[in-house]
């Protein structure tokens, strides 16, 4: 058996620290306005609807949803399923590209036929509140999205 050097131990510690830092790829703020940060910088979404799709999936707390379910909730007044499905595919592709640009491509999961957010890879005030009950919620939740009012009322 080889003796272990201090350098070997430090290398292993750095590897473990690196893994821990990589565990949470994004910081997501749901209380107040919905915002997403990567490495302390605000993530820029090309389309507001892409950001809203991500917010919607966060609101679902990692639950898998089919494209049809997402369209039914996100486009309730539009009955053109083909058009809605095509638009959703564009939004999903845009979301994938946005997340990839900040090194967080694994956050969005596509498990045919469903989409979901891998909540283990994000730090989120809403999810932390649900898990711990710490009093972080001050009455405002994803204020820019009217569909989030139901969740806000439940909190």
Give residue spans per PLM region.
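Intrinsically disordered, low-complexity protein-interaction/activation regions
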Residues: 4-155
């Amino acid at each position: 058996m080889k003796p272990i050097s201090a350098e070997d131990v430090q290398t292993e510690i750095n590897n473990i620290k690196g893994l821990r830092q990589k565990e949470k790829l994004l910081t997501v703020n749901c209380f107040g306005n919905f915002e997403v940060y990567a490495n302390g910088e605000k993530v820029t979404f090309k389309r507001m609807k892409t950001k809203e799709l991500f917010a919607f999936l966060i609101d679902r707390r990692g639950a898998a949803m089919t494209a049809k379910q997402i369209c039914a909730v996100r486009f309730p007044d539009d009955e053109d399923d083909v058009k809605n499905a095509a638009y959703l595919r564009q939004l999903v592709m845009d979301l994938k590209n946005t997340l990839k640009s900040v090194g967080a491509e694994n956050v969005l999961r596509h498990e045919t036929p469903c989409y979901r957010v891998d909540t283990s890879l994000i730090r989120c005030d809403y999810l932390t509140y649900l898990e711990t009950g710490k009093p972080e919620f001050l009455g405002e939740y994803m204020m820019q999205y009217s569909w989030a009012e139901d969740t806000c009322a439940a909190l």
